[in-house]
């Protein structure tokens, strides 16, 4: 049974998003089909964000970032996983993204996870963030 108030948003990392959604009983939504109504009708989000090699958000995520800025996130819980990017090059951009979400009312839950880094463990991360979603 899917928990409709939790949405896992992804771009090219669909397999990871589906694994997270299965663990949470959530639905997945492609960043390319994300819209304001989905933001308004959902309580919690897991964002599998992607960054360009030189730092900023990928173009699809830049679009969704604008959607999030245009909608109140007050009372919404957000967990952020960097599905494509690394903390050395993209860390400052990831923090800026989180700050924008906070300024718009979102409650960021858990630590930011960088997929594929040394010691990353998706199961542990999902267990850590799930009680707060």
Residue ranges with predicted function:
Residues 2-7, 11-27, 39-133:
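FMN-binding flavodoxin-like domain, especially the glycine-rich phosphate-binding loop
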Residues 30:
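Adenosine-cofactor binding site in Rossmann-like domains, unifying the SAM/SAH pocket
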Residues 36:
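Helix-turn-helix
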């Amino acid at each position: 049974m899917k928990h409709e108030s939790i949405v896992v948003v992804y771009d090219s990392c669909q397999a990871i998003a589906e694994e997270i959604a299965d663990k949470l009983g959530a639905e997945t939504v492609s960043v390319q089909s994300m819209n304001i109504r989905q933001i308004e009708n959902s309580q919690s989000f897991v964002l599998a964000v992607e960054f360009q090699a030189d730092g900023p958000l990928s173009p699809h995520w830049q679009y969704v970032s604008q959607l999030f800025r245009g909608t109140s996130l007050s009372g919404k819980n957000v967990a952020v996983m960097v599905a494509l990017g690394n903390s050395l090059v993209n860390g400052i951009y990831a923090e800026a993204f989180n700050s924008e979400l906070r300024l718009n009312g979102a409650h960021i839950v858990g630590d930011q996870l960088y997929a594929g880094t040394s010691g990353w463990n998706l199961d542990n991360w999902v267990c850590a963030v799930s009680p707060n979603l």
